[in-house]
Amino acid sequence: MSSVVETVTNLVTPILDENHFELVDVEFVKEGKSWYLRVYIDKPNGINIEECALVSDKLSEKLDSCDPDPIPQAYYLEVSSPGAERPLKKEKDYERALNKYIHISLYQAIDGQKVYEGTMVDLNKETLTLEYRVKTRTVTKTFDRNKIAKARLAIKF
């Protein structure tokens, strides 16, 4: 599957560069009996449906013209924004999320917990620091970034 992701990344990058869009993520996943190629794009002020359709059309043309076909099985192509709970994958994503409410999942539990949500109050190459509430107390905890399995923006309720 990684070769599909790499191929699609290489095909879509010039389209995005030409339109000043950013590639957030590419996924090629099987759900039930169907395969989905998902391309998440964004730009500083947010992406709209027409821009997603433009990228979808251009990427579809490029994929159809490849020989041999990089994706031999049938699949659904979806191009969309990363949504309100966008994943944090690149360094730039983490920098933009500073002072925002985020969700992190750890590879291994710390203090019996693998999932944390809070405001990221500090960030450097090795660690990030979250501030969150435990009942009536505000807690600040620093996490090694190499111990974080996934991170994303979160909506605070």
Curated annotation (Swiss-Prot):
InterPro entries: Ribosome_maturation_RimP, RimP_C, RimP_C_sf, RimP_N, RimP_N_sf. One of its GO terms (biological process) is ribosomal small subunit assembly. Its main location: cytoplasm. SUPFAM superfamilies: YhbC-like, C-terminal domain, YhbC-like, N-terminal domain. It is found in: Cytoplasm. Required for maturation of 30S ribosomal subunits. Belongs to the RimP family. This is Ribosome maturation factor RimP. It comes from Ligilactobacillus salivarius (strain UCC118) (Lactobacillus salivarius).
